[in-house]
Curated annotation (Swiss-Prot):
Monomer. Its EC number is 2.7.4.3. Its main location: cytoplasm. This is Adenylate kinase. GO terms for molecular function: adenylate kinase activity; ATP binding. InterPro entries: Adenylat/UMP-CMP_kin, Adenylat_kinase_CS, P-loop_NTPase. Pfam families: ADK.
Amino acid sequence: MNILTFGPNGSGKGTQGSLVKKKYNLAHIESGAIFREHIGGGTELGMKAKGYIDKGELVPDEITIPMILETLKAKGGNGWLLDGFPRNMVQAEKLWEALQKEGMKLDYVIEILLDRQIAKDRIMGRRLCANDPNHPNNIFIDAIKPNGDKCRVCGGDLKTRSDDQDEDAINKRHDIYYDTNTGTLAAAYFYKKLAGEGKTKYIELEGAGSIDSIKETLLSQLD
């Protein structure tokens, strides 16, 4: 089973992806990690990418997509779940073409729907436990709301990440994601159109629900 996921930062996309990965024993492949692995490993593609990154430039799709395909083939023997790519319409088209050329099927595309303001609130509401960063706390999500200013799990002190409080940075990321003309949602709709043609399956999930309710709905729609 091969899956592509879409959802704004704050939608719980990573959480649901991890749950699906565990249930179906998929390789959870995140685009940022691919860059780190290739650069850290000193691969030819990684060094080319590093040259652009060091100059503060975007890595061209002609480098990024081969890196992704190489990783999918190397780690996705039992299936894969790709997170964080494509981020725009052009990348969506190029990735689809590359998958077709390699004979790699795309079984499902998952989109988690979430209002932009709710997504922003969730990001800014994140709190990190000083004892264990894996203890989820968020002042805007009832199920994981902290106990006052203490961790809901262990009672430890809480802190915030500086980038979670940077409204300008959050808005810029969301400007790209919610752009239905050329941005990430345009990419998602490209695959939705393919699903309408029977070339893949498209699952839409309402992200405002609880983690468990979203999980149940998602798993019920996966074969």
